[in-house]
Amino acid sequence: MNVPAQPPTWSLHPQLGADTSNIGDLPLARVLLMNDANYPWLVLVPRRPDIVEVIDLDDEDQEILWREIALLARVLKDVTQCDKLNIAAIGNVPQLHVHVVARRRGDAAWPRPVWGAGPPRPYEAPERDRLVAAIRREIAFG
């Protein structure tokens, strides 16, 4: 008997899960909050299996991802009143993820990039919960 192969399933890379809190799901991407209170920092992870680079997504998913990045960037800017947004698909975790980081003049790394600027400062639960609630008020997560 020939049993059809099961399609691959998506799961969050353990390193991304260890460093973040789940905010919710958009049509394509899971939205995570990086556990670093030095910077309001979101991570979007497309919920597609075996995707490492943006170019691994089909054209439609690439367009959806950029719309979701823009949506989250606008919300993060409004919620944090930041001076600048940093948006990047950077790092070596072998699962596509896009960082959206709110920056303020005088933050712990300003004006340098946040990567490698110093140790993360984990969120206290009330501070994290306030930021997550503010973001959820602006976006209808699935």
What are the residue ranges of the model-derived segments?
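HIT superfamily nucleotide-processing domains
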Residues: 1-142
